[in-house]
Amino acid sequence: MLNHTKKIKEIYEDIQRRLYYMIPEKWDKLYLYSSVLDEPDKEGKTGELFFYYIPKGIFKKKPVNVYEIPLKFNLDEIQYLKLVEILYQKIKELRKEFKKSDEKEIWTNITLSIQNLRFKVEYDYTDLNNTEFSSYERHVIWRYEYLGISETQVSKDEKEILRRYMSGAKTIARKEHYDTGIYIQDIENMVAYSTENYDDNNEEVEEIPDKIEKKHKNQILFSQEEMEKMKFNKK
């Protein structure tokens, strides 16, 4: 069983805060996937991160991808992606802390979920450098398993990916789980946003006619900590 040290728990609390900060609307559920590899995979990647959240509402809402948020809420994409990068650095820091606990084998990817004030983590030890599925294909499979996006909701190519996955031999990889409560209070969004041009019943941002002057993008607020980290990364 993994040793969740005080430092690891502090990193998780920091990750939780960042996730709450980065979502500029009320939501019910959140699922995050991230991988961290010691060596580049077949595509030359050493890891990735994405998350989806389910907006709060009376009617069933579609999952929103983190990379859709800037367009959906008229945010500066470059600034927002800096927040995503900082979040990924926290995941890498988390993995380094687990390495310090004398683990002979370290996880390659994790799935975090937040729902009903519970914070759950699934640690997956699959060897991503020796898998038949590409990063994109694993993303499709992950959405199927965790978001419930079925074959009827995806493209023809994605259906083929799911067919291969479901009909192929399953490799049983080591997995471990962690479950704890969320006790963070007085959480504020890091994003100062306006909903003036946002319709909660519409999946798209309201289109502004060309003849009307477009308003400035909503401001993303960085804390002093974030500013210092970005300065450090530029060195």
Describe each region flagged by the PLM:
Residues M1-I8, Y12, F73-Y80, L87, ...:
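Intrinsic-disorder-associated interaction segments
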Residues M1-L71:
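N-terminal "first-domain core" detector
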Residues Y12-D14, E85-E103, N233:
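Short linear interaction motifs
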Residues P55-K96:
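A broadly used, surface-exposed interaction patch
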